[in-house]
């Protein structure tokens, strides 16, 4: 019998989740950047900038951007590593990857792009100085397997940056719940003509491990040290793991 997992609040067979997540992102790819700005009031740019500026990534480094989507972090990494470095933009969703590749090319940013499953990364052991995954981990079926793969491809001393929605500060919960479950689907319907995908977004955030649970998952995956920073009252958290 097939094992089950969650897709938002629904229980589905593990073998079905990836396909259902793919449908969501095929649907929203063309409006993804517009919706990110609208939903977060532009704050997603601040969160990503914080990730980049506190990373310690420098010229010549090799960086893997997992679930990189439309390329926000990849563009930032490319600027930091310069011509002597190497940045890979990867995503499991071809629609998102196409939008990201085309957007980067339009901006004159040329870097390798790969359609890749985070649970089975097509890269050698101990290759990258840094790995990032922004707003992608919660959509993965086997998060533990994906985290182990991220650890595998990092060099000793390399860092993993997980930027993801997390458990919000308790006094903000009533407003945040109203916004997530009432406003987001309406915005999704009006802007992207897809309320269901943004209902899934709200549900997937609530089902994602909280800050301390994710920290322990990263330690269990092989990272020697893990810290996290809450951003915007815990709406988002940036976890940093170091491979020893």
From Swiss-Prot:
GO biological process: aerobic respiration; menaquinone biosynthetic process; methylation
InterPro entries reported in the protein's UniProt record: SAM-dependent_MTases_sf, UbiE/COQ5_MeTrFase, UbiE/COQ5_MeTrFase_CS
EC class (word): transferase
Catalyzed reaction equations: a 2-demethylmenaquinol + S-adenosyl-L-methionine = a menaquinol + S-adenosyl-L-homocysteine + H(+); a 2-methoxy-6-(all-trans-polyprenyl)benzene-1,4-diol + S-adenosyl-L-methionine = a 5-methoxy-2-methyl-3-(all-trans-polyprenyl)benzene-1,4-diol + S-adenosyl-L-homocysteine + H(+)
GO molecular function: 2-methoxy-6-polyprenyl-1,4-benzoquinol methyltransferase activity; demethylmenaquinone methyltransferase activity
PROSITE patterns assigned to the protein according to its UniProt record, in alphabetical order: SAM_MT_UBIE, UBIE_1, UBIE_2
Pathway: Quinol/quinone metabolism; menaquinone biosynthesis; menaquinol from 1,4-dihydroxy-2-naphthoate: step 2/2; Cofactor biosynthesis; ubiquinone biosynthesis
SUPFAM superfamilies in UniProt: S-adenosyl-L-methionine-dependent methyltransferases
A Pfam family of this chain: Ubie_methyltran
EC number of this enzyme: 2.1.1.163, 2.1.1.201
Transmembrane helix as UniProt keyword: no
Binding site for S-adenosyl-L-methionine: 70, 91, 117-118
Keywords in alphabetical order: Menaquinone biosynthesis, Methyltransferase, S-adenosyl-L-methionine, Transferase, Ubiquinone biosynthesis
Top-rank lineage group of the source organism: Bacteria
Family: Belongs to the class I-like SAM-binding methyltransferase superfamily. MenG/UbiE family.
UniProt xrefs under NCBIfam families: MenG_MenH_UbiE, PRK00216.1-1, PRK00216.1-5
Known role: Methyltransferase required for the conversion of demethylmenaquinol (DMKH2) to menaquinol (MKH2) and the conversion of 2-polyprenyl-6-methoxy-1,4-benzoquinol (DDMQH2) to 2-polyprenyl-3-methyl-6-methoxy-1,4-benzoquinol (DMQH2).
Protein name (database record): Ubiquinone/menaquinone biosynthesis C-methyltransferase UbiE
Species the sequence originates in: Chromobacterium violaceum (strain ATCC 12472 / DSM 30191 / JCM 1249 / CCUG 213 / NBRC 12614 / NCIMB 9131 / NCTC 9757 / MK)
């Amino acid at each position: 019998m097939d094992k089950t997992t969650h897709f938002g609040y629904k229980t589905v067979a593990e073998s079905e989740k990836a396909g259902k997540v793919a449908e969501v992102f095929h649907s929203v790819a063309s409006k993804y950047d517009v919706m990110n700005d609208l939903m977060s009031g532009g704050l997603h740019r601040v969160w990503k900038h914080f990730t980049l500026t506190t990373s310690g990534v420098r010229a010549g480094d090799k960086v893997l951007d997992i679930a990189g989507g439309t390329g926000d972090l990849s563009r930032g990494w490319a600027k930091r590593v310069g011509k002597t470095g190497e940045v890979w933009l990867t995503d499991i969703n071809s629609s998102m990857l196409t939008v990201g590749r085309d957007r980067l090319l339009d901006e004159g940013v040329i870097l390798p792009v790969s359609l890749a499953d985070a649970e089975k990364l097509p890269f050698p052991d101990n290759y990258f100085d840094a790995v990032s995954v922004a707003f992608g981990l919660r959509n993965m079926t086997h998060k533990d397997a994906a985290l182990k793969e991220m650890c595998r491809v990092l060099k000793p001393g390399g860092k993993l940056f997980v930027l993801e929605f997390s458990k919000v500060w308790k006094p903000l919960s009533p407003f945040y719940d109203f916004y997530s479950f009432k406003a987001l689907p309406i915005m999704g319907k009006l802007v992207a003509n897809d309320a269901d995908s943004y209902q899934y977004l709200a549900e997937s955030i609530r089902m994602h491990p909280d800050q301390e649970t994710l920290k322990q998952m990263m330690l269990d995956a092989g990272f020697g040290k893990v810290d996290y920073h809450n951003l915007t009252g815990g709406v988002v958290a940036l976890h940093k793991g170091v491979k020893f």
